[in-house]
């Protein structure tokens, strides 16, 4: 009841207080302070979810930071790099190598051979297809300093919490540059929706080595896009080469965490081209302009060249090909060496990540997953049976239906910028990522790669409609709609995350008591 009362008071303040109905241009400091509070609360929630996971399984709140065990990211890759090799130290068994097709799960099961699950098998050696950036930046230095292995849950918390911070900073910079005429109550609701629907929370509930790749990629993508805005390549102000270099360095590092995120490097190229024209405009002509452009090109492209070249050399050292990341050599249920494309599998991902309407029940937490395989024939890997479409987890995503009206409200220059800048980051990259997961199956954590970017695009359309086309009464309706969307986003995401958490450990009775607190009418 107290939580409901606090939420009601917050909504009352957002709808009535003049300072919260003022625009960002009128109250920039206030919005900055509120952003800091929302971010701090989000990080506290991340800590709480991690502690719940830890205690529910071991009865201890924190991991052993002097542990001598780990997984293929925290230990096996660390040991391999320490030994000066790219293959893992453990050798495949002769029985495994003797199989006609060791990538066939049924053959491995029938023969009863031992093998490392979800590792790569190539040319008689084990490898890992997970990105090397977390290893080089955290796990390997920690091992060299302490002789121990950094624990996985705390690593996921570290990467995820920093990602939450930089997502807020990105949104603050986005507002500062493009949304100064939008009221604070809309912006506050938007930040709540953006953070709630980012998908990073699922990683704290089940922090395994998969989630290391997911959260580290999330961190460096948010950091890179924030620095890209701060660099001034678009919007007012001069171009900052230091921030630009940091942006491409971060986005390139995200690829070394999770190769799928290379799409955001590609999406950044129109930003870099636009910034190049801005940086060199009126400064020189002919060859003199080339000399002026060299520092910009180095800051913008050199990190991509160095990091991309390093990844290609790493690929070649393992698989004899610069462009082979090795995913097809995985020892899992699916034989990726013989994988066949099926449009039905693509549809499963699009439906569950974007459209699936969650189940509503009169039992806590009231909102439940509604995953569907769409009656597809054949085997489709399901890692986590937890689904709720982005349209319902972030109702402002419906803003895309106003794209035609927003397009008509823009002049030619703004249309060009929207096509070159907003479309690649918020629409094309998320859509391609969604398309690409058909081969891997469904896991709710995958939304961490694209969710907030897709949500931002819908919000941007609504902001433009508010500023350009809405009358006074329509603006009031939009303000209320954003607040309602924030409440729905908070409720739906909280319910889905609660349903994703395990409740069969030390805290089973406490989870039951929590549910009874909300079911106060029973």
Regions found by a protein language model. Name each.
Residues 188-195, 243-249, 301-302, 412-436:
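Transmembrane alpha-helix segments characteristic
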Residues 227-252, 291, 299:
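Short hydrophobic alpha-helices at membrane interfaces in multi-pass membrane enzymes
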Residues 216-236, 251, 265-268, 453-457:
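Specific aromatic-rich, kink-prone transmembrane helix
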Residues 148-180, 223-227:
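Transmembrane-helix motifs of polytopic, lipid-linked glycan transferases
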Residues 376-416, 463:
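Hydrophobic, aromatic-rich transmembrane alpha-helices
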Residues 264-305, 408:
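Perimembrane helix-loop-helix junctions
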Residues 83-130, 144, 171, 195-204, ...:
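Interfacial juxtamembrane loops and adjacent helix segments
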Residues 2-72, 187, 288-303, 478-484:
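Start-transfer (signal-anchor) and selected internal transmembrane alpha helices
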């Amino acid at each position: 009841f107290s939580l409901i009362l606090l939420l009601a008071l917050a909504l009352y303040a957002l709808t009535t207080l003049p300072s919260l109905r003022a625009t960002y241009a009128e109250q920039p400091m206030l919005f900055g302070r509120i952003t800091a509070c929302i971010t701090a609360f989000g990080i506290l929630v991340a800590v709480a979810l991690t502690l719940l996971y830890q205690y529910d399984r071991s009865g201890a709140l924190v991991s052993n930071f002097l542990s001598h065990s780990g997984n293929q990211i925290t230990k096996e890759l660390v040991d391999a790099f320490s030994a000066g090799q790219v293959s893992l130290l453990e050798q495949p068994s002769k029985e495994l190598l003797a199989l006609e097709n060791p990538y066939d799960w049924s053959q491995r099961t029938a023969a009863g051979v031992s093998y490392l699950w979800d590792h790569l098998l190539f040319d008689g050696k084990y490898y890992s297809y997970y990105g090397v950036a977390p290893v080089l930046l955290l796990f390997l230095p920690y091992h060299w300093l302490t002789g121990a292995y950094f624990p996985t849950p705390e690593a996921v918390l570290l990467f995820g919490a920093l990602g939450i911070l930089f997502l807020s900073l990105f949104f603050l910079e986005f507002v500062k540059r493009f949304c100064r005429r939008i009221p604070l109550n809309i912006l506050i609701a938007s930040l709540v929706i953006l953070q709630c629907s980012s998908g990073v929370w699922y990683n704290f509930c089940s922090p395994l080595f998969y989630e290391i790749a997911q959260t580290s990629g999330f961190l460096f993508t948010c950091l890179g896009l924030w620095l890209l805005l701060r660099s001034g390549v678009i919007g007012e102000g001069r171009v900052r080469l230091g921030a630009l270099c940091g942006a491409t360095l971060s986005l390139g590092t995200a690829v070394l965490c999770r190769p799928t995120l290379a799409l955001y490097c590609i999406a950044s190229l129109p930003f870099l081209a636009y910034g190049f024209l801005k940086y060199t405009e009126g400064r020189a002509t002919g060859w003199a302009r080339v000399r002026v452009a060299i520092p910009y090109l180095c800051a913008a492209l050199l990190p991509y060249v160095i990091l991309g070249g390093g990844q290609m050399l790493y690929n070649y050292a393992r698989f004899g090909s610069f462009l082979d990341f090795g995913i097809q050599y995985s020892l899992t249920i699916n034989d990726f060496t013989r994988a066949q494309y099926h449009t039905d599998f693509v549809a499963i991902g699009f439906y569950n990540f974007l459209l699936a309407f969650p189940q509503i029940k009169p039992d806590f937490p009231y909102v439940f997953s509604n995953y569907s395989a769409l009656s597809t024939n054949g085997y489709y890997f399901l890692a986590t049976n937890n689904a709720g479409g982005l349209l319902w987890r972030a109702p402002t995503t419906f803003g895309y239906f106003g794209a035609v009206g927003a397009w008509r409200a823009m002049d030619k220059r703004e249309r060009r910028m929207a096509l070159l800048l907003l479309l690649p980051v918020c629409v094309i990259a998320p859509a391609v990522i969604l398309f690409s997961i058909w081969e891997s199956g469904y896991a709710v954590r995958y939304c961490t790669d694209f969710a907030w970017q897709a949500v931002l695009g819908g919000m941007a359309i609504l902001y433009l409609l508010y500023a350009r086309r809405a009358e006074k009464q329509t603006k009031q309706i939009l303000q209320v709609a954003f607040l309602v969307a924030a409440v729905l986003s908070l409720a739906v995401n909280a319910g889905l995350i609660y349903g994703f958490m395990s409740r069969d450990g030390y805290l089973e009775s406490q989870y039951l008591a929590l549910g009874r607190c909300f079911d106060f009418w029973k």
